[in-house]
């Protein structure tokens, strides 16, 4: 198969839907020689910031000189973004070769029973781990796909566990309240492995995490208590902060909320130190100062300012809205598209507060809320709301509406931002 055929086969697996559980991924990896046992790892779960924390952790490891892997999901524009080594996406030819090998095992498993057929995410996870193993990755930052306890990534034996802030999400699969969702995410905690979290020690979610850690004999380190950091300033040039005992660091990522994410990555580096992986202060500082993570309060254009942000929970929307209030004096032109397993009304409320007008849209996935439903949520918060079915057409319309002094915000989902970014990148390349 060539590259496009390979992608076609992979994405064809999405018809298998979502099947949470570890039996199939365990069998598939065993047939591949258990590649997950050939590298060390940091496992990252949570609702807000887990991708950013994973990227920061990988950047720190790379700047220390380790051969570092990064596995995240979903992707923004290119599938290969999900699987990186030292900041380089998996090559097309490597992807094709490994998928061809995986396909044989998948077809063999399908002969056993339809229930044993691996899903898209399980195959993608096996692909990532195989690439890491054969490429000599020493340590990888691995982001959970959904939940944690039954997520396909939960076959690794990490050196550190990170759980970011938790919000209501994926309620169809993870539970209808924060306690249930926290229980699923705490399912990645392994016996004797330290847990780092940004959850408030007063929250219900933290109580669940702490209890799970206690049962497995794991110390818990809380950002803001055990791991200290301080925001010095946030501007269009980045986020200046003081962290732990390494002093001032300037993150290239915008948003004061990135400070807590950086503190978790710093905490992971310190824990890896304790477990025998040398990571110097300079590597932490350089890793954080040079991290790249597109689609997170990313300014891609000026006159007007065009901002892409993948926030998909009310907590994330609130944090981004507060930062945009600080960074810009004017109200924004909002383009919003949200998946149907998210808290649309909560997201719309926070973004609506800072918007003078809005374009409701929907990314091209059956999982998205219809654009008209998004508009309904926005109308109670924004003076003027219009509907545009296509994300690209919404962006075109937003650019036409915005004056040179305006801020145009595209947000609500990684899928929404991904479609906008793909079009924007092509436009800029002309």
Which ranges hold each PLM region?
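ATP-dependent carboxylate-amine ligase catalytic core
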Residues: 22, 26-30, 34-37, 63-156, ...
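Nucleotide phosphate-binding/pyrophosphate-handling subdomain across enzymes
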Residues: 38, 134, 139-144, 151-162, ...
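N-terminal leader/targeting and accessory segments in enzymes
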Residues: 1-48, 52-67, 76-78, 194-204
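C-terminal helical cap/extension that packs against the catalytic core
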Residues: 199-217, 221, 236-237, 305-308, ...
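Extended acidic/charged loop-beta regions that coordinate divalent cations
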Residues: 124-173, 206-248
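Active-site-proximal loop/hinge segments that shape catalytic or ion-binding/gating pockets
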Residues: 413
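Hydrophobic alpha-helical packing residues
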Residues: 57-62, 132, 351, 378
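Beta-strand->loop->alpha-helix junctions that form or flank phosphate-binding loops
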Residues: 71-72, 197-200, 212-234, 251-256, ...
């Amino acid at each position: 198969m060539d590259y496009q055929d390979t992608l076609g086969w992979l994405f064809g697996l999405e018809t298998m839907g979502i099947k949470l559980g570890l039996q199939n991924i365990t069998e598939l990896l065993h047939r591949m020689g258990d590649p997950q046992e050939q590298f060390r790892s940091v496992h990252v779960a949570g609702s807000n910031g887990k991708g950013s924390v994973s990227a920061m952790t990988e950047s720190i490891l790379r700047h220390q000189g380790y051969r570092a892997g990064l596995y995240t999901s979903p992707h923004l524009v290119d599938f290969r973004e999900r699987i990186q080594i030292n900041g380089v996406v998996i090559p097309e030819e490597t992807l094709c070769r490994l998928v061809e090998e995986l396909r044989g095992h998948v077809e063999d498993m399908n002969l056993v029973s339809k229930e044993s057929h691996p899903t898209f995410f399980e195959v993608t996870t096996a692909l990532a781990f195989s690439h890491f193993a054969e490429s000599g990755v020493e340590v990888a930052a691995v982001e959970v796909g959904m939940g944690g306890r039954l997520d396909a990534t939960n076959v690794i034996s990490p050196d550190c566990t990170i759980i970011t802030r938790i919000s209501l999400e994926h309620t169809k699969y993870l539970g209808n309240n924060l306690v249930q969702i926290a229980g699923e995410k705490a399912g990645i905690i392994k016996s004797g492995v330290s847990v780092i979290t940004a959850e408030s020690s007063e929250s219900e979610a933290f109580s669940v995490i702490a209890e799970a850690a206690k049962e497995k004999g794991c110390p818990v380190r809380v950002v803001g208590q055990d791991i200290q950091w301080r925001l010095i300033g946030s501007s269009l040039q980045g986020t200046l902060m003081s962290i732990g005992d390494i002093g001032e660091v300037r993150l290239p990522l915008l948003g004061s909320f990135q400070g807590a994410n950086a503190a978790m990555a710093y905490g992971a580096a310190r824990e890896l130190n304790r477990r025998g992986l040398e990571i110097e202060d300079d590597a932490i500082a350089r890793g954080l100062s040079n991290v790249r993570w597109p689609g997170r309060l990313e300014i891609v254009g000026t006159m007007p300012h065009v901002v892409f942000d993948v926030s998909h929970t009310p907590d994330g929307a609130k944090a981004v809205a507060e930062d945009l209030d600080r960074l810009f004096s004017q109200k924004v032109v909002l383009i919003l598209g949200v998946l149907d397993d998210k808290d649309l009304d909560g997201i719309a409320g926070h973004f609506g507060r800072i918007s003078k007008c809005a374009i409701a849209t929907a990314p091209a996935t059956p999982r998205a809320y219809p654009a008209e439903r998004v508009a309904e949520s926005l109308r109670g918060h924004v003076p003027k709301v219009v509907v545009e079915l296509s994300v690209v057409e919404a962006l075109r319309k937003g650019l036409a509406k915005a004056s040179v002094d305006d801020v145009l915000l595209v947000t609500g989902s990684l899928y929404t931002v991904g479609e906008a970014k793909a079009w924007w990148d092509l436009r800029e390349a002309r």
